[in-house]
Swiss-Prot record:
Record organism: Methylobacterium radiotolerans (strain ATCC 27329 / DSM 1819 / JCM 2831 / NBRC 15690 / NCIMB 10815 / 0-1)
EC number: 2.7.1.148
Protein's name according to its UniProt entry: 4-diphosphocytidyl-2-C-methyl-D-erythritol kinase
GO biological process: isopentenyl diphosphate biosynthetic process, methylerythritol 4-phosphate pathway; terpenoid biosynthetic process
Gene name, Swiss-Prot/TrEMBL: ispE
SUPFAM superfamilies: GHMP Kinase, C-terminal domain (SSF55060), Ribosomal protein S5 domain 2-like (SSF54211)
Length: 290
């Protein structure tokens, strides 16, 4: 049988409001507008080979041991829930930076679930697919159908897909991995504590870019300030983006990746070229978010 293939796009938090930390499980309660980039990892599945995973690509090294990769965790989880599930050998071409605040591992796991669902004739809203997505990681469910939408809670409340116009953007990672846990520790919320702040703006189902940018200007990423204490270079990356004349610059997730929105594709490509020349050690990607 021929190989099955899918993309695992970067997930970008255009906003990320932390509402508090809930009693019971201690999870932080979030409200976030997420979009997905044209920049992506690539995952293939060979159904004629035994279950396994190989990894190549420019960021394969930092991705860590394959046995603990979320791709295999998702595949094994689905096999445990669906008797007779056909699987196979996965190959991941890793292009996205690791521990970078853009959900690379979660998107890879979601791509694995899509490939297995396609191979076995399962709809993406199959109960087992959704359950395994939730078990594999908080960001995996929103990555199953990678289109812009609101997500809330600890990732379990996912809104309908939004009809955003494609947003010309540049993503930058300054080459410093930033695990999520230290950033949340730096935020310093106790269990049961709420975080004061302006409410998240309402994002209509279909939003013109200028209207969206006005809404984004009234929003924030509450993890940006604590992430700067963990990795101050994030501030340098944001300053470098703002110097290129962008319309908005912000950190994604818990960092260290930052993004900027530009007036058009040409401006984004021009800014990316200038940033690569000035910072050859940084990961820089002109793209669209949608």
């Amino acid at each position: 049988m021929t190989l099955l293939a899918d993309r695992a796009p970067a997930k970008v938090n255009l906003t990320l409001h932390v509402l508090g930390r809930r009693v019971g499980d201690g999870y932080h309660v979030l409200e976030s507008l997420v979009a997905f980039a044209g920049t992506a990892d690539r995952l293939t599945l060979d159904p004629d080979a035994p279950l396994g995973l190989t990894v190549s690509g420019p960021t394969a090294g930092p991705a860590g041991p394959t046995d603990d990769n979320l791709v295999l965790r998702a595949a094994r989880g689905l096999a445990a829930r669906v008797p007779g599930l056909r699987a196979g050998a996965f190959h991941l071409v890793k292009r996205l930076p690791v521990a970078a605040g853009i959900g690379g591992g979660s998107s890879d796991a979601a791509a694995a679930l899509r490939l297995l669902a396609r191979l076995n004739g399962l709809p993406l809203d199959h109960a087992a697919v959704g359950a395994v997505a939730r078990e594999t990681g908080a960001d995996v469910p929103v990555c199953l159908d990678p289109r812009a939408r609101m997500m809330r809670g600890a990732g379990e409340e996912i809104g309908a897909a939004l009809g955003l116009e494609p947003l010309p953007a540049v993503l930058i990672n300054p080459g410093v991995p930033v695990p999520t846990a230290p950033v949340f520790r730096a935020l310093g919320l106790s269990v049961g504590q709420d975080l004061a702040g302006a409410p998240h703006p309402t994002i209509p189902q279909a939003t013109a870019t200028d209207t969206l940018l006005q809404a984004l200007a009234g929003a924030r990423n509450d993890l940006e300030a604590p992430a700067l204490t963990v990795a101050p270079v994030i501030g340098d990356a944001l300053a470098a983006l703002r110097a290129q004349g962008c319309r908005l610059a912000r950190m994604s997730g818990s960092g260290a990746t930052v993004f900027a929105l530009f007036a058009d594709r040409r401006a984004a490509v021009r800014a990316a070229a200038a940033l690569r020349a000035a910072h050859p050690g940084w990961w820089v990607a002109p793209t669209f978010l949608r």
